[in-house]
Amino acid sequence: IEHGPRDFFPNPASKDPEYQFKLAAEAKYSALACQIGMAEKYYPDYAGEVPLILKVNGKTDIPSSAHAFSACNATVEDAVRLGADAIGYTLYVGSPRQDEDLAQLRQVRQDCDRFGMPLVVWSYPRGEAVDAKGGPNSFYAIDYAARLAMEMGADVVKLNMPKINPEKDKDAPAPYNEMEV
């Protein structure tokens, strides 16, 4: 749900959810991540061909990301029922709602441990505090996001690639503001 209809305009065929599963099967993707509705409707026809990462939380890109939070809309039990191979969770590091996010992630991680499911965390810096310390794509913010996801129990962490921006990097805490990358 983070990728709304506008994301499909460059490739109109991708508007069809089944296209994504067909492409993943034909190209032998290592996995396909999707929300519960797509997984329930399309995954049964591709089980065994395409490994599934069930995203258990998500948000639209309609509201600003200043107070980013992705509510859970599926469970680890749903993933087990569907035959998923892993759980996906988006964590917004630095958001004013980070405490809620971490509590929600704790429950998801406990359920992953209980069911033996690997946990993939999309760890993205967001919010005014992040903006004030170099921005969401600074090395500082990405490094922190990686570390937090690992410490929270992620088996795999998905991050944005840091972008070097000397003008913004000077706002990062030491020693990040002095690093030459």
Show the residue positions of the predicted features.
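Alpha/beta enzyme core
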Residues: E2-V181
